[in-house]
Structure formats: structure tokens, C-alpha cells
């Protein structure tokens, strides 16, 4: 009886509940001062074209709090940190399930761990 109930539960559960959402950051470990940093976030388990989904980039300098950098919405609308707006560009390639962040004119104060997050 328990097996039957579990099977029925699986059959009636929407597929999005069973899917696993993952976001994986990739990019260089080090960049030199004045260079441009390009980071890629490859997502799975959801679509970048979904009207309720967006992806943000955030960073955390050593020993400091998280800092939000940029966000891209499903309709391609973009939002940037006011203090870094002139150095940041966020874009997405829905066909590759990727969100790319570029940050120009890197400086030692930009040393941090960079993360992407679904919001």
C-alpha cells in the first residue's frame, strides 16, 4: 500500500518539483590589474526564458560580506550595482543556458569569490 501511494504521488507531482536546479560558475582564477574578467554561469533545471526566473552575480571579498553585482531578467532587462555599473556587463545566451558577466579594469580590490544565483 505504501508503495502504491508513493507511486501515485510521483505521478501527480509536477515535473518542475522533481528537477534539480544547478548553476555552475566558470572563468579564470586570476586576472591581472587593468584586465577584463569574464565569468560564465551555466544553468540547468530551469529555463532562462522563464518569465519568473532571473540570474544575479554576487561576490564575496575575503573576510567581507556578500556584494550584489548585477541581475538579468528573463525579458533581458538588466540591473547593475550603482557603484560598479560603468565596469559591468551582464548578458545571457538562452540557447546555451548561460549568463555571462564581464568586469573591466580589474583591480586588487576586486579580489573575491564570484557566484551566480537564481533569483
UniProtKB/Swiss-Prot annotation:
InterPro entries named among the record's database cross-references: Ig-like_dom, Ig-like_dom_sf, Ig-like_fold, Ig_V-set, IgHV
Pfam family, one: V-set
PROSITE patterns given in the database record: IG_LIKE
GO MF annotations, alphabetized: antigen binding
Function: V region of the variable domain of immunoglobulin heavy chains that participates in the antigen recognition. Immunoglobulins, also known as antibodies, are membrane-bound or secreted glycoproteins produced by B lymphocytes. In the recognition phase of humoral immunity, the membrane-bound immunoglobulins serve as receptors which, upon binding of a specific antigen, trigger the clonal expansion and differentiation of B lymphocytes into immunoglobulins-secreting plasma cells.
Signal peptide: 1-19
Compartments where found: Secreted; Cell membrane
Keywords: Adaptive immunity, Cell membrane, Disulfide bond, Immunity, Immunoglobulin, Immunoglobulin domain, Membrane, Pyrrolidone carboxylic acid, Secreted, Signal
Region (Framework-1): 20-44
Modified residues (Pyrrolidone carboxylic acid): 20
UniProt keyword annotation of Iron-sulfur present: no
Keyword flag Chaperone: no
Positions of region (Complementarity-determining-1): 45-54
Main location: secreted
Region (Framework-3): 79-116
Protein name from the UniProt record: Immunoglobulin heavy variable 2-26
Region (Framework-2): 55-71
SMART domains found in the cross-reference section: IGv (SM00406)
Assembly behavior: Immunoglobulins are composed of two identical heavy chains and two identical light chains; disulfide-linked.
GO CC terms: extracellular region; immunoglobulin complex; plasma membrane
GO biological process, one term: immunoglobulin mediated immune response
Amino acid at each position: 500500500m505504501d508503495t502504491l501511494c508513493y507511486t501515485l504521488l510521483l505521478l501527480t507531482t509536477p515535473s518542475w518539483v522533481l528537477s534539480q536546479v544547478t548553476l555552475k560558475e566558470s572563468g579564470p582564477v586570476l586576472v591581472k590589474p587593468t584586465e577584463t574578467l569574464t565569468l560564465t554561469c551555466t544553468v540547468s533545471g530551469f529555463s532562462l526564458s522563464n518569465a519568473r526566473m532571473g540570474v544575479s552575480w554576487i561576490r564575496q571579498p575575503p573576510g567581507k560580506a556578500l556584494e550584489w553585482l548585477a541581475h538579468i531578467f528573463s525579458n533581458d532587462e538588466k540591473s547593475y550595482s550603482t557603484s560598479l555599473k560603468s565596469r559591468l556587463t551582464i548578458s545571457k545566451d538562452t540557447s546555451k543556458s548561460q549568463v555571462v558577466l564581464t568586469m573591466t579594469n580589474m583591480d586588487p580590490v576586486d579580489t573575491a569569490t564570484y557566484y551566480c544565483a537564481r533569483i
